[in-house]
Amino acid sequence: MKKSIIAVIIIAVFGAVVLMQYSGTYNEAVNNQETVDQSWNDVSAAYQRRADLVPQLFETVKGAAKNEKEILTAVTQARAGIVNAQTPEDMQMFGKKINTAINLAFEAYPQIRSTERFADLQAQLEGTENRINKARTDYNATIKNYNTHIRGFFTKMILNNEEFPRKEGFKASQGAEKAPEIKF
């Protein structure tokens, strides 16, 4: 009788160990799968940030550049008049036009900063691309962790391959090695 109780206890303990191993392996696979999904969502969020931010940045820079172009055009036209002036009166008149153009321009646009805007644009673009690259790198790391787990010896025996398929990491699209053109 004692031998049968000991055998039942050993079988129960063995069954409990197997069940705990199975549940631990399964739960880790689920956790890794969710981490992969979250990581991909981070990549998508970085792409969405770029899609939302870049057009706004370009419009800001284009607006600043347009304002400065208007100022430069007015000053250049007035200055051309001075060069072509025949008399001192003409020279004085075009000088006043230059001063008026400059004063009006600076009153309308007290801080002419298109160069700073372009530098800000460049910094924002670089930061955005760095965020995307970091999200892709993190995604690939979570894929590696997930795939390593599901391909482990005991894990492979325990898990259903259809429920936990191998995942592919981020791969650049064809032509991605070429820098995109930016036109103003």
Can you name each region flagged by the protein language model?
Residues 1-184:
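A helix-centric hydrophobic-segment signal that preferentially recognizes long
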